[in-house]
Amino acid sequence: MAKRSRSEDEDDDLQYADHDYEVPQQKGLKKLWNRVKWTRDEDDKLKKLVEQHGTDDWTLIASHLQNRSDFQCQHRWQKVLNPELIKGPWTKEEDQRVIELVQKYGPKRWSLIAKHLKGRIGKQCRERWHNHLNPEVKKSSWTEEEDRIIYEAHKRLGNRWAEIAKLLPGRTDNSIKNHWNSTMRRKVEQEGYLQDGIKSERSSSKLQHKPCAAMDHMQTQNQFYIPVQIPGYQYVSPEGNCIEHVQPTSAFIQQPFIDEDPDKEKKIKELEMLLMSAENEVRRKRIPSQPGSFSSWSGSFLMDDNMSNTLNSLDEHTSEFYSMDENQPVSAQQNSPTKFLAVEANAVLSSLQTIPEFAETLELIESDPVAWSDVTSFDISDAAASPIKSTPVKLMRIQHNEGAMECQFNVSLVLEGKKNTCNGGNSEAVPLTSPNIAKFSTPPAILRKKRKMRVGHSPGSELRDGSLNDGGNMALKHTPLKTLPFSPSQFFNTCPGNEQLNIENPSFTSTPICGQKALITTPLHKETTPKDQKENVGFRTPTIRRSILGTTPRTPTPFKNALAAQEKKYGPLKIVSQPLAFLEEDIREVLKEETGTDLFLKEEDEPAYKSCKQENTASGKKVRKSLVLDNWEKEESGTQLLTEDISDMQSENRFTTSLLMIPLLEIHDNRCNLIPEKQDINSTNKTYTLTKKKPNPNTSKVVKLEKNLQSNCEWETVVYGKTEDQLIMTEQARRYLSTYTATSSTSRALIL
């Protein structure tokens, strides 16, 4: 977008300069103008005066209007009230005419261009060109990066849309204003648009100029300083996220601009410096401020070709490589993520060879690289063991040309040995088992921050990771973990017999509980932390003893739901009446469940009597539908009947374990009279099949058996079919079958 100068605005607004008046005279009259807005009455009066006096003498017209000058009257008429003015949309012919006139006169002489367009003023032509007809104007949809720039610029500049438009080439001030008022303001204020990304940038933009000074100071003090800004590459934050707004903004700033405006280039350079200073501030915050301690991050050199290093040279020159601010104290407990500096051999080798110690070391390593790669040849000094108990291990990886061995050097030991004025040149290197060596195809001098996975340390694991053992062995020791052939939950779910379980002392289960932290390879110990001091005691599920729960049976929820659905659909459930007749198998099953023994089986070794188990569970069975009568007549002759009184059997301590109910059959087919109920009951009580059993030594069961036998009389009446309605049905069945027995000798069952 071409810059609009102040002379252009004056040329547009002071169109009278093309007529009878001179600009210097009107500039002096500007002080006398009444800046009050024109009213409708003044507009109507001005129209009438122009119709009467014409547009030749504006001084005469201004004399009829109070507090209005001749220039104001002329400007109001020519710009607003003239009926010949066209205020509607632009036609294609007008747009084509504007394009031709701009190519002829340039994009600044709008009053001259407006004279060739009837009904259009210079302001209309200028806005039409800059907002629509200019080929450099972007008409594509707004991107998120453009929205972010508008949001940040609007916070600093407010509604100065012309200044904001300078930051967005291809976007006009009018389009930016319309985009903000129509879309962005609502999204920012109501929906929180762009709020998350801005919060992370505020901390880096507070100190805009101070990081630059610190950066210059760092560069002058340290000859090994590597510049931060590298075109085409980005940094990786400790959390794994890159500084997202740096890369697109940098690319945007580096793009060429069409307009060669010095002010615009100055603004762009200021923004670029602001961005770089913010980036440096973020980088400086990640670096610990205490030199030599390296308690917050681990440095790693990755070098190729003939590049090697030793701990002697690291002892003397590593602290010089990293220049840090000494004024800000850093706690030893801070553990920032690991930073890795990837350096190519050609970029650093030349500077390292100038140091005598490095040159001698390189010659020694090149002469025998295999010996220098041997891990066991390095020893650790005892002086470096004491001051670094809380310092984490810093790993230094060096890649040799021939051996292709990756070694890890304890940099922190070297630096701590230097602080104690000890010779820390000897340290131990731990070879890595992985043969893969990192290869970098990136340009030299790239500062990278790699992500390092950290696990919460226990007091035992702290010793493994960062501290030294008393014996002087510096190899990293880790407890070997091997897969178990069984599930640990088998032991967690079992409870020893001598341990008393309660709510205060719960048993260990396979479900992890906060506070019970135990490794698989170590024995379990009872925790001594009081219950009220646990971390999330309010959120733990209490251990409930099963003995506390009631012994009453509980109906399952699905069964309750099914019963409720049935009652809702079909009404309340009704008890089904007992059937009138039973088959022999069904009666045997019921008697077996009630008495506990099978009354039809003669077994000598079974107990005399079993206690009643439950109520009648067969009450909900189907109605029995058949009677077998004919077979009973044939079996009657082979059945041995022993008629003895029940009281006599109890005196002899003998119990009936096999009670066979033999129904009364008709001896004569023509017998039709009903048998009295009393006679049937008496005959039934006298008809039993007796089997001798061993006497039961438990006398308490004898009393219980007597009560059961007395209480079962009524029940036996129902079971044996001796109620009134059952006898009626049985007699009717006999009458019905008597007709078949006379004509046919084959027996058949009656299906009711």
Swiss-Prot record:
SMART domains cross-referenced by the UniProt entry: SANT (SM00717)
Gene Ontology CC terms: nucleoplasm; nucleus
Record flagged with keyword Nucleotidyltransferase: no
Residue ranges of DNA binding: 58-81, 110-133, 161-184
Positions of the UniProt region annotated as Negative regulatory domain: 298-553
Region called Disordered, residue ranges: 1-22, 451-480
Cross-referenced InterPro entries: C-myb_C (IPR015395), Homeodomain-like_sf (IPR009057), Myb_dom (IPR017930), MYB_TF (IPR050560), SANT/Myb (IPR001005), Tscrpt_reg_Wos2-domain (IPR012642)
Sites bearing N6-acetyllysine, chain numbering: K394
A Gene Ontology biological process term: cell differentiation
Superkingdom to which the source organism belongs: Eukaryota
Protein location: Nucleus
Region (Transcriptional activation domain): 230-295
GO molecular function, one term: DNA-binding transcription factor activity, RNA polymerase II-specific
Domain HTH myb-type positions: 30-81, 82-137, 138-188
A Pfam family the protein falls into: Myb_DNA-binding
Tissue distribution: Expressed in a variety of lymphoid and solid tumor lines cultured in vitro.
Cross-link (Glycyl lysine isopeptide (Lys-Gly) (interchain with G-Cter in SUMO2)): K199, K592, K602
The entry's keywords: Acetylation, Activator, Differentiation, DNA-binding, Isopeptide bond, Nucleus, Repeat, Spermatogenesis, Transcription, Transcription regulation, Ubl conjugation
Subunit details: Component of the DREAM complex (also named LINC complex) at least composed of E2F4, E2F5, LIN9, LIN37, LIN52, LIN54, MYBL1, MYBL2, RBL1, RBL2, RBBP4, TFDP1 and TFDP2. The complex exists in quiescent cells where it represses cell cycle-dependent genes. It dissociates in S phase when LIN9, LIN37, LIN52 and LIN54 form a subcomplex that binds to MYBL2.
Biological role stated in the UniProt entry: Transcription factor that specifically recognizes the sequence 5'-YAAC[GT]G-3'. Acts as a master regulator of male meiosis by promoting expression of piRNAs: activates expression of both piRNA precursor RNAs and expression of protein-coding genes involved in piRNA metabolism. The piRNA metabolic process mediates the repression of transposable elements during meiosis by forming complexes composed of piRNAs and Piwi proteins and governs the methylation and subsequent repression of transposons, which is essential for the germline integrity. Transcriptional activator of SOX30.
The protein, known as: Myb-related protein A
Organism name: Homo sapiens (Human)
